[in-house]
UniProtKB/Swiss-Prot annotation:
Similarity remark: Belongs to the DapA family.
Chain's gene name: dapA
GO cellular component term, pick one: cytosol
Keywords tagged on the record: Amino-acid biosynthesis, Cytoplasm, Diaminopimelate biosynthesis, Lyase, Lysine biosynthesis, Schiff base
Pathway: Amino-acid biosynthesis; L-lysine biosynthesis via DAP pathway; (S)-tetrahydrodipicolinate from L-aspartate: step 3/4
Protein name: 4-hydroxy-tetrahydrodipicolinate synthase
Reaction catalysed by this enzyme: L-aspartate 4-semialdehyde + pyruvate = (2S,4S)-4-hydroxy-2,3,4,5-tetrahydrodipicolinate + H2O + H(+)
Signal peptide positions (record): none
Catalytic residues (positions): Y137 (proton donor/acceptor), K166 (schiff-base intermediate with substrate)
Lineage of source species: Bacteria, Pseudomonadati, Chlorobiota, Chlorobiia, Chlorobiales
Residues flagged as site, Part of a proton relay during catalysis: T48, Y111
Binding of pyruvate, residues: T49, I208
Source organism of this protein record: Chlorobium phaeobacteroides (strain BS1)
Enzyme Commission code(s) on record: 4.3.3.7
Length: 297
C-alpha cells in the first residue's frame, strides 16, 4: 500500500455512556455529525480520551462501526486499537480494520517498559497484520517510557504502513529530530493542544486534539492558519483557547472534557471507574471558562 499523508485537525473522541454505564450510541452519532459540520479532518474513537481501557473488545468494535457508518466518506476514521500485549494489540488492530477503521492509532506498550527494540518489534508485528495506516502513539506521561525518535524513524523507513506518529511528549528536541529526519510521506502530529502553534511552526502536520471535542471549528481554524503560514491569526486563536487547553487536563483526561460536553448538553456526565467526577472547585473553573468562550450561558 502507499501511505496516506495524515494531517489537519483530528479529534480524540470521547465515549458517551448512559447512567446504566452502557455505551450511548445515539450520543456518538450526534458527536460525529457535530464534527462533520465543523470540518474536522479525522475522527479517532476508542483512544485514551475515549476511555478505551474500560471498553470491552465488543464495545470497541461497535463504536468503530457506528462512527464509520455516520462519518461515511466525509472524514477519515482512525480507531484507537492498542495495548501492552503485542498479540492482543494485533487482535484489536485486525478487529478495528474489519469494523471499518481506515487507519489505526496504537498506543506504545505501557507498564512492561520494553526496550527500543521491543517497541520496534511490537509495532512491526501490528503493521504486518493489517493493511491500513498505523499511527504510533508515543505518550510517555501515561506509558512510563519513551519511544525514541530513532525507533520511530526506523519504523517509518522499514514498515510501509507505519504512516504517522502522535507525539504526545513535550520533548522538543525529540520533536525537532522527528520533523527534520522523517520520510516525506510520514506524518508527525502533536497530541498536545497547547503545542499546536509551536509544533506546526516547526513543520508538524497537525493535532490529535482533546479540545476539538468542544470547539472543533476553532481548532480546525488554528491548524489551517498554521498550514497557511498566518502566524498572527493563529496566535489570536491560540491565545483565546489556551486556558481551555490547560483546563482540559486539570484532572485526568477525559474527565474535564466530558464534564464540559455534559454542560453543553451533548452527553451525560458519566464515567467508568476508576475515573470519577471532577472536584467541585474544578467544575467551577471549567464552567467559568466555558461561559467566557460562549459555550454555555
Amino acid at each position: 500500500m502507499s501511505k496516506r499523508k495524515l494531517s489537519g485537525s483530528a479529534v480524540a473522541l470521547v465515549t458517551p455512556f448512559r447512567q446504566d454505564m452502557s455505551v450511548d450510541r445515539e450520543a456518538i452519532r450526534r458527536l460525529v455529525h457535530f464534527h462533520i459540520a465543523a470540518g474536522t479532518d479525522i475522527l479517532i474513537p476508542c483512544g485514551t480520551t475515549g476511555e478505551s481501557p474500560t471498553l470491552t473488545a465488543d464495545e470497541q468494535t461497535e463504536i468503530i462501526e457506528i462512527v464509520r457508518e455516520e462519518a461515511g466518506n466525509k472524514m477519515l476514521v482512525a480507531a484507537g486499537a492498542g495495548t501492552n500485549a503485542t498479540e492482543e494489540a494485533v487482535s484489536l488492530a485486525s478487529n478495528a480494520q474489519k469494523a471499518g477503521a481506515q487507519a489505526l492509532l496504537s498506543v506504545a506498550p505501557y507498564y512492561n517498559k520494553p526496550s527500543q527494540e521491543g517497541y520496534y518489534q511490537h509495532y512491526r508485528r501490528i503493521a504486518e497484520a493489517v493493511s491500513i495506516p498505523v499511527i504510533v502513539y508515543n505518550v510517555p506521561g501515561r506509558t512510563g517510557s519513551n519511544v525514541h525518535a530513532e525507533t520511530i524513524l526506523r519504523l517509518a523507513h522499514d514498515c510501509e504502513n507505519i504512516a504517522a506518529v502522535k507525539e504526545a511528549s513535550d520533548n522538543m528536541a525529540q520533536i525537532m529530530e522527528l520533523l527534520a529526519s522523517r520520510p516525506d510521506d510520514f506524518s508527525v502530529m502533536t497530541g498536545e493542544d497547547s503545542l499546536i502553534l509551536p509544533f506546526m511552526a516547526l513543520g508538524g502536520d497537525g493535532v490529535i486534539s482533546v479540545a476539538a471535542n468542544l470547539l472543533p471549528a476553532e481548532v480546525k481554524q488554528l491548524v489551517t492558519e498554521m498550514h497557511e503560514g498566518d502566524l498572527e491569526k493563529a496566535r489570536v486563536i491560540h491565545n483565546r483557547l489556551r486556558r481551555l487547553f490547560s483546563l482540559n487536563f486539570i484532572e485526568s483526561n477525559p474527565v474535564p472534557v466530558k464534564y464540559s460536553l455534559s454542560l453543553m448538553g451533548m452527553i451525560e456526565e458519566v464515567y467508568r471507574l476508576p475515573l470519577v467526577a471532577l472536584q467541585p472547585e474544578n467544575k467551577e473553573k471549567i464552567k467559568e471558562e466555558l461561559r467566557n468562550l460562549g459555550l454555555v450561558s
